[in-house]
Regions:
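Short, well-ordered beta-strand core segments
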Residues: 27-29, 114, 150-152
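Conserved P-loop
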Residues: 1-61, 65-68, 72-73
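Conserved, well-folded catalytic cores of nucleic-acid-processing
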Residues: 58, 74-77, 150-153
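Structured loop/turn residues at beta-strand edges in well-structured enzyme cores
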Residues: 61, 110, 145
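Conserved nucleotide-binding/hydrolysis micro-motifs of P-loop NTPases
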Residues: 24, 33-37, 71-73, 120-124, ...
Length: 210
């Protein structure tokens, strides 16, 4: 069973930039919006990835690290594509497609980590949560509750960090002792190393057993 890591943050908080220290062959980038990465790199990526392509990549499971950047756009693009449809059924379908993607993540090998990046939004009480479309996903399926690790991307006075434990207004969480501090540098490769060391997973870049 693969490990999903949810990364939530506003635009400009360094979510994509956190990939900067990965080397080619270490991670598969499923680039939903097709945007260029914000740093020089030769990382292999699949631009304009949609659900079927994401499922195919995860089923192949040829790497032991993937990132879906930004998973929220899967919902947005699906909603635009079906804009002329009325009724609750559209949102049921959208919720099912998203949930099936999460199942595909869980279906990868035990040494595979899949990072799911999403934009943030705030509820009426100011609490941060992943930005979703439709009440079914928002109310019936607590997306952040399906992940054992949730990181919040922040820009604090020009310092880009991941929050690893909640401050009371975020769903940030991680296992006890996995990270030395509540706020860490937004280096996703260092995060990957910490997760693998904590749970004794195969090192980054090794072939998956999937």
């Amino acid at each position: 069973m693969g490990i999903g890591v949810l990364i939530i943050g506003d635009s400009g908080t360094g979510k994509s930039t956190s990939l900067r220290n990965f080397e080619r062959g270490e991670i598969g980038i499923l680039n939903v919006a097709g945007k260029p990465l914000p740093f020089r790199n030769d990382l292999a990526r699949l631009d304009n990835a949609r659900y079927n392509q994401i499922h195919q990549a995860l089923m192949k499971d040829s790497l032991n690290a993937y990132v879906i950047d930004d998973a929220g756009y899967l919902l947005s693009f699906d909603n635009f594509r079906r804009a002329k449809e009325n009724g609750y059924g559209k949102f049921v379908d959208m919720a099912q497609s998203f949930e099936q993607m999460l199942e595909a993540i869980a279906g990868t090998s035990a040494d595979t980590i899949v990072y799911v990046m999403m934009h943030a939004e705030r509820d009426a009480d100011g609490r941060i949560k992943p930005k979703l479309i439709g009440k079914m996903l928002d109310e019936k399926l607590c997306v952040e509750g399906l992940f054992s690790i949730v990181l919040i991307a922040r820009n604090i006075d020009g310092r880009y960090v991941f929050e690893t434990q909640t401050d009371g207004l975020t769903p940030a969480k991680s296992p006890i002792g996995m990270f030395a501090e509540r706020e860490i540098d937004n280096d996703l490769k260092a995060v990957d190393t910490a997760i693998r060391e904590y749970w004794n997973l195969k090192p980054l870049g090794g072939e998956s057993d999937g």
